[in-house]
C-alpha cells in the first residue's frame, strides 16, 4: 500500500473519528475558554500544508539546510507582517509556544540564579513567570508581586517596593488571568529604577494591543512575548518582539541554537496568514466586539448576583469569584461543561483552595465573538451560566438544570454555524 496517497479516513479511522467528533463539539458548545479561539480556513490550510515536510534550522538566508527558498519567503512574510502589526523593529516568529518564547528571553538575558520579579500565580500570573513547579521557578530566584487585597488591581507600589528590595535582573509585566489594563509605562519606570530588563508578556491581550485597544508595551518594554493564538486568532505558537535590535540578536541566538532546533515551517506559514488577517480593517472591529461582549457578560452575571473580580473587565476576560456562593471553581466548570458551556476553573487572588479545585471560574469572549456573537447573545449566555450556578447553590445534583440549559445552548448554536 502506498501510504502517501491515503487520506486520513483510509489510513487511520480512529483519529478521523476523533477529529470529526471534536469538530461536532466545537460547533455545538459555547466556548468561553479565554485562551481559545477559532482559526480561519485559510490558517488551517496553511497549517496542514506540505511545508510540514521541510527542515529549516536557522533563519532566512542563514539556514543549515538547502532547499529553503520557499520557506524563507514564508518566514520573512510572517516577520514583516507582525512588525507592521505592532509597529516594532524586531520580531522572531519561531517559538513553538508562548512558554518557549518566555524561556528564550530568560536564556538570552539572564544567568541561572538571577532574580526575576513577576505576578504571583494566584493574582493572575502565568506559570512561566516564576512559579515554583515551572523551570522559571527552578532556575531563577523568583519573587512575586500581587494585586491589592481590596481592589484586586496590580499594586504598583508593592511592585516598586519589591524591586528595590530584591534588585531583579528581569521584571515581568503580564498575566494569564487579569481583567484590567496594565500600565507598561509604570513598569518601565520601576525597571529603570533598579536597572532591570522589562519583559511584557501580552499573550492574552496581543490583539488588543495590535488594534490600539490597550497601551502598547513596545515603547516601554525591552522585549515583548506573546502567543499567536488567543486574541491574535492564529495557530498555536509564540513570538518575540522588540524595538532593541541588539537584544534581538541575543534572542535569535538564544532561541536557535540555544533552545529549539528546526522551526515548524507549516506553523510559521499559518502565522503569516493570521497576521495578514489581523492587518485587515475588520480585525479592529472584531477586537472592539470582543471587549464589548466581555463587558456585557460581566454585567449580566452581576445582575444575577455574582461577584465579578475587580467589578468588571477592560479586556476579553471575566473572572467570577464564587467564594460567597459556596461553589468551587472545579464544580462550576464541570457542571457548565455538561450543559454545553466550556470554561475553566481558576484561582482568584489570595485563594486558599487547591489550584486543582479553586474558588473561581474564568470566561473569555474571543472564540464566540469569532462565530459572530454580539452583546445580546452574551447577556443570554450570562443568564445561562447563572442558571447553572444557581442550581449548584441549592442542589448537589444539578442534572435537570444542566439538561435544560444544554437544550438552550443547542438552539443558540444552530444560529452560529462555523466549520462546515
Curated annotation (Swiss-Prot):
> Which biological process annotations from GO are given for this protein?
glycine biosynthetic process from serine; tetrahydrofolate interconversion
Q: Which domain of life is it from?
A: Bacteria
- Name its co-factor(s): pyridoxal 5'-phosphate
The entry's (6S)-5,6,7,8-tetrahydrofolate-binding residues are 121, 125-127, 246, 354-356
What GO CC annotations are associated with the protein?
cytosol
Its subcellular locations are: Cytoplasm
What InterPro entries does the record point to?
PyrdxlP-dep_Trfase (IPR015424), PyrdxlP-dep_Trfase_major (IPR015421), PyrdxlP-dep_Trfase_small (IPR015422), Ser_HO-MeTrfase (IPR001085), Ser_HO-MeTrfase-like (IPR049943), Ser_HO-MeTrfase_PLP_BS (IPR019798), SHMT-like_dom (IPR039429)
Pathway of action: One-carbon metabolism; tetrahydrofolate interconversion; Amino-acid biosynthesis; glycine biosynthesis; glycine from L-serine: step 1/1
Q: Give the enzyme's main class according to its UniProt record, as a single word.
A: transferase
The molecular function terms of the Gene Ontology recorded here are: glycine hydroxymethyltransferase activity; pyridoxal phosphate binding
What reaction does this catalyse? Answer: (6R)-5,10-methylene-5,6,7,8-tetrahydrofolate + glycine + H2O = (6S)-5,6,7,8-tetrahydrofolate + L-serine
Q: Does the keyword RNA-binding apply?
A: no
Modification type N6-(pyridoxal phosphate)lysine: residues: 230
Assigned EC number: 2.1.2.1
Q: Which UniProt keywords apply?
A: Amino-acid biosynthesis, Cytoplasm, One-carbon metabolism, Pyridoxal phosphate, Transferase
Q: What does this protein do?
A: Catalyzes the reversible interconversion of serine and glycine with tetrahydrofolate (THF) serving as the one-carbon carrier. This reaction serves as the major source of one-carbon groups required for the biosynthesis of purines, thymidylate, methionine, and other important biomolecules. Also exhibits THF-independent aldolase activity toward beta-hydroxyamino acids, producing glycine and aldehydes, via a retro-aldol mechanism.
Give the family, as the similarity comment puts it. Answer: Belongs to the SHMT family.
Its quaternary organisation is: Homodimer.
- The identity of this protein, by name, is Serine hydroxymethyltransferase
From what organism does this protein derive? Rickettsia prowazekii (strain Madrid E)
